Amino acid sequence: MATTHLDVCAVVPAAGFGRRMQTECPKQYLSIGNQTILEHSVHALLAHPRVKRVVIAISPGDSRFAQLPLANHPRITVVDGGEERADSVLAGLKAAGDAQWVLVHDAARPCLHQDDLARLLALSETSRTGGILAAPVRDTMKRAEPGKNAIAHTVDRNGLWHALTPQFFPRELLHDCLTRALNEGATITDEASALEYCGFHPQLVEGRADNIKVTRPEDLALAEFYLTRTIHQENT
């Protein structure tokens, strides 16, 4: 598929298991309505006209993905993921073709809104380093004493943000930063942290707080509520 400088490739690392969900089924394959969480997450990306391809990195032993309609979608590419998220993202970047910019989106974050995605993608016109969707911290934050469930002190929440996805960067820059961070043993918790490690300062694009990641059992019902509400709003 031919690409232009405006075209974007999305990478979805989906090789994880998610033990906190307390289920034998990987969380991305749990269902909300008639689709899996992974399908909801990917369809939100495919809905934007600039996203020409989505690369999904799955576990080499994954037998579930082939059973989904996504497996035969013409804009979907599947690659083997790695042991860590960064390894899966790097595998996805290698299959991103000529796209100059890439989105990275959590497989278990199904409630992405199109207006948030559009504002994030607009960074390609104004930024050289990209940025992430994020939500300002609203709750009081506590720091625990080391090794204890006891409060050490209250953390000033001014300037604190919850990092969300998608995260959006120039493809070559993200590749180089992830590679360097992994080679030097840095702790990488998301793609932005790799750029931070290399001295860059990605932008924060405020996104909706209901763009939740399904991590624990109680998140499933909340995500279902948000998705049902969104579908109702779009149909009225």
UniProtKB/Swiss-Prot annotation:
EC number of the protein: 2.7.7.60
GO biological process assignments: isopentenyl diphosphate biosynthetic process, methylerythritol 4-phosphate pathway
UniProt xrefs under InterPro entries: IspD (IPR001228), IspD/TarI (IPR034683), IspD/TarI_cytidylyltransf_bact (IPR050088), ISPD_synthase_CS (IPR018294), Nucleotide-diphossugar_trans (IPR029044)
Enzyme class, UniProt record, top EC level: transferase
Site (Transition state stabilizer): R20, K27
SUPFAM superfamilies: Nucleotide-diphospho-sugar transferases
Pathway stated in the Swiss-Prot or TrEMBL entry: Isoprenoid biosynthesis; isopentenyl diphosphate biosynthesis via DXP pathway; isopentenyl diphosphate from 1-deoxy-D-xylulose 5-phosphate: step 2/6
GO molecular function (one): 2-C-methyl-D-erythritol 4-phosphate cytidylyltransferase activity
Keywords attached to this entry: Isoprene biosynthesis, Nucleotidyltransferase, Transferase
Keyword Lipid biosynthesis: no
Assembly behavior: Homodimer.
HAMAP family with a match to the protein in the record: IspD
Family the entry assigns: Belongs to the IspD/TarI cytidylyltransferase family. IspD subfamily.
Protein name: 2-C-methyl-D-erythritol 4-phosphate cytidylyltransferase
Organism of this sequence: Escherichia coli O6:H1 (strain CFT073 / ATCC 700928 / UPEC)
